[in-house]
Design a protein with these regions (language model features):
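Loop-to-transmembrane helix entry
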Residues: 67-85, 109-113, 137-138, 172, ...
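C-terminal transmembrane helical hairpin of 12-TM major facilitator-type secondary transporters
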Residues: 108-156
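A late C-terminal transmembrane helix in Major Facilitator Superfamily
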Residues: 89-90, 162-201
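Extracytoplasmic gate region of multi-pass secondary transporters
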Residues: 29-94, 146, 150-154, 158, ...
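Intrinsic disorder in cytosolic terminal tails and internal cytosolic loops
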Residues: 9-23, 101, 105, 237-247
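Multi-pass alpha-helical transporter architecture, strongest
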Residues: 125-131, 216-247
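Short, small-residue-biased leader/transition segments that mark boundaries at the very start
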Residues: 1-8
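A membrane-interface helix-boundary motif in multi-pass transporters
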Residues: 71-72, 110-113, 194-225
């Protein structure tokens, strides 16, 4: 019965935000005048590149660090395990509902709390290189958990757009966030490639690792804290639930 009441409350909450706004519209320029837009865009900018780094560079990492090719049996098993762990994100979208039921928070506040929880999981990626000296399975598991956390984070950050903006503006805001995420991804992938070339050429040393492994450790450090930085800035820009009301 309580769950049914909470579902009704969730629907009522959403309806009150958008009740009189369906016929109103927001210009593309207006979108950039709201802190909520910048909060969403920054969250995407900081984190989208991490996901694509995990996907794009994982085979190269296994080859560089462990001399394991993904065309081999072990390499395929490792990549399969990484992607299988990432599928744990299926349960990530349920956490805000659990928080709402237990605390009575509004959906936006519950989503932000869930995102904070997810933002801590990528810190495990910091252990990828140190534990990689024991077995290649450890970094694969750490990266897989980081990937699962990203998808859980991503599902919730997209939902915050619907919490804060009227229906007529959701597509524009989502597009702005997607663009910011694309730019962030481009910067991270390009920078990672340049860093790996530099690290290999100069035999860079970082935290006891030399050459490309040192470069990977640097990028893993960046990826691991990106979500916490993104969340902190989002929270600073929009500390409390504040829907956009079009006049």
């Amino acid at each position: 019965r309580r769950q049914r009441q909470m579902c009704i409350r969730d629907r009522t909450y959403t309806a009150t935000v958008k009740e009189n706004e369906e016929k109103k519209s927001m210009t593309f320029r207006q979108c950039f005048t709201y802190r909520q837009t910048w909060a969403f865009a920054f969250g995407k900018f900081m984190t989208d590149g991490v996901w694509w780094f995990f996907l794009f560079w994982a085979p190269s990492y296994l080859n560089t660090q462990f001399d394991i090719k993904t065309s081999e049996g072990l390499g395929r098993a490792l990549i399969f395990t990484l992607y299988a762990i990432t599928m744990l994100s299926i349960y990530g979208g349920k956490l805000p509902t659990i928080i709402i039921h237990k605390t009575g928070l509004n959906p936006y506040a519950a989503r932000m709390r869930a995102m904070l929880i997810f933002a801590f999981f990528p810190l495990l990626v910091l252990l990828a290189q140190p534990l990689g000296t024991i077995s290649p399975w450890f970094p694969v598991i750490m990266i897989g958990i980081g990937g699962a956390a990203h998808q859980s984070w991503s599902a919730n950050i997209f939902s915050t757009v619907g919490d804060m903006f009227p229906k007529s503006a959701i597509a524009s805001i989502t597009g702005i966030g997607g663009m910011a995420g694309g730019v962030g991804s481009m910067i991270l992938q390009y920078s990672a490639g340049e860093l790996f070339v530099h690290a290999d050429k100069t035999q860079m040393v970082f935290m006891g690792f030399v050459g490309k492994p040192a470069g990977y450790f640097v990028i893993f450090c960046i990826c691991s804290v990106a979500y916490l930085i993104g969340w902190i800035v989002m929270k600073a820009l929009v500390p409390k639930y504040k829907p956009i009301i079009l006049n």
